[in-house]
Amino acid sequence: MLPSLLEVYDEPFADSSALPSLLLSKITKEDVTVALSGDGGDESFLGYNHFDLVKKPNYFLYIPYFVRSIISMLIPKFIFKHRAEKLKRILKIKNDHEFIEGIFTGYNSITLDRSLNWLSNYKNYKHLSRNNYQRTADLNIKLWLENDSNVKVDRASMAFSVEVRSPFLDYRIIEFARTLPISYRYYPGKKKRILRDVLKKYIPEEVFDQPKSGFSVPLGDWIREDLRKEMLEVLSDENLKMVHNLNIPKFKKMLNDHMDGNADYKSYIWRVYVLVKWIKNNNLDEKNYQ
């Protein structure tokens, strides 16, 4: 389905869950033409797993920053391996605002630096609320939902002429959710609380009281096994030179570490793979696409 992915999205779209979205749309079309989607529910009713992270800064931010900086320099890489970089970045967080930004820029990334300013366009948006949970939800809506989730579902469904309706994206639902106390929407161990309370009136709770699971594929294993040859051919030194401003030695090390099973860099490898394929498919070079 990789050729279909590039054709349907017509841009370097590197959310790997687009693949199962295409497959689901294909199967759905066999029975129905119009389907309902739950997109927007996690944003308004605090359902994502990373909302559990929002409370964590309250614990270690009590430790003076200079103390945490010293601790970060003492973390032994040979013990923590690829998690060492993540721990260092977390320890160097200066305040809760920076932590929330880190949820989206990825503190486990060695390819993204916290000095990146791409979030600056949304600083006013995220400060519409003083509550860290709501501010995180606002960023989810503006960055993830708008630029990823909605794009993914819309193009995957329309590729097979399936009409997807998303009732949680009704502006009245979103505005109503913002008026509810955080405790009505989230508390540890039971996310989307109010939706669960409504649903259990109609469906036995044991049916839907399950751990949250993303719409993911075994991408890491695919890269090492089924797609190994494809990956190594596409991510050759010659092709990587077409990607503007890519640190090729660092990326090649990430690729090799992943292939050897020493680290998990599947999301970063997949992004570069999709970008290279998009550049080649459109006969682009550095001068006319950057």
Describe the residue ranges of each PLM region.
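Secretory-pathway/luminal and periplasmic proteins that interact with or process carbohydrate-rich
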Residues: 65, 148, 207
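Short amphipathic alpha-helical segments and their helix-coil junctions
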Residues: 2-5, 118-131, 244-262
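Short acidic (Asp/Glu) and glycine-rich catalytic loops that position anionic groups and cofactors
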Residues: 123-124, 152-157, 172-179, 206-211, ...
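ATP-dependent adenylate-handling active sites, centered on carboxylate activation for C-N bond formation
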Residues: 1-120, 156-202, 260-263, 268, ...
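PAPS-dependent sulfotransferase catalytic core
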Residues: 203-262
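Structural motif
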Residues: 14, 127-140, 255-272
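Phosphate/pyrophosphate-binding loops and the adjoining catalytic core of nucleotide-dependent enzymes
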Residues: 145
